[in-house]
């Protein structure tokens, strides 16, 4: 046996992904045709345990495994007796992204990505399988960026994209971020009066939150806004749309995205009491 090759050194432990071994048998400098080669393995299943060389002296077998671990394949010929160990390969479990679940940074809750986003909200993706070394990529960082080493995703704008993780053994897995129903953004330039806040939202083709409940639901999903890197304020009071009665009274309701503290039907719309928090 003068030549030994494996087409790769790692494979997925799914019983399907195969490593192909090629050996060449020669005698007196010439290819040896019809020579029987016996293969053995320490892990997995070989396509055949014995094969005869072709007219060029080559023989190929493939190896699969349903179990993870390292495998050493040996080849031997009968005349003269020769045992030769081939390249060691390793089978890894299939790479996945935690069954499509995310971990919300602000709450620690695990599950599906909420369909209403807090802009600059962050979630952690967790990879399983492969060789344990992962690199993350976003197909559209303007919609959602991802930390290449940790898998932490930052949601930036309303849209859809995919996050891909690649393991050190060259497996890939993809997490799809679907279009949300809406995204809630905070204009952090400062507190403004109600009408200014309303116009800020209209200018970005959004609107003020329809109610205290809409912001409470956002808080329940994402936790306090300042749990995220983008927000450092100790208080982010948000205007909500006036009801018809509010308009008569010149007041509106507010809700704090950090402290909660709902103020219902009592905040003077003429004062710079809250931020323009917009739903788009």
Swiss-Prot record:
Signal peptide: none annotated. Gene3D superfamilies: 2.60.40.1080, Immunoglobulins, Mannose-Binding Protein A, subunit A. Residues 1-92 form the Big-1 domain. Residues 127-173 form the BIG2 domain. Pfam families: Big_1 (PF02369), Big_2 (PF02368), Intimin_C (PF07979). Its main location: membrane. Disulfide bonds join 201-278. Keywords: Cell outer membrane, Disulfide bond, Membrane, Virulence. It is found in: Cell outer membrane. InterPro entries: Big_1_dom (IPR003344), Big_2 (IPR003343), C-type_lectin-like/link_sf (IPR016186), CTDL_fold (IPR016187), Ig-like_fold (IPR013783), Intimin_C (IPR013117), Invasin/intimin_cell_adhesion (IPR008964). PROSITE patterns: BIG1. It comes from the Bacteria. One of its GO terms (cellular component) is cell outer membrane. An inverse autotransporter. Belongs to the intimin/invasin family. This is Intimin. It comes from Hafnia alvei. The gene is eaeA.
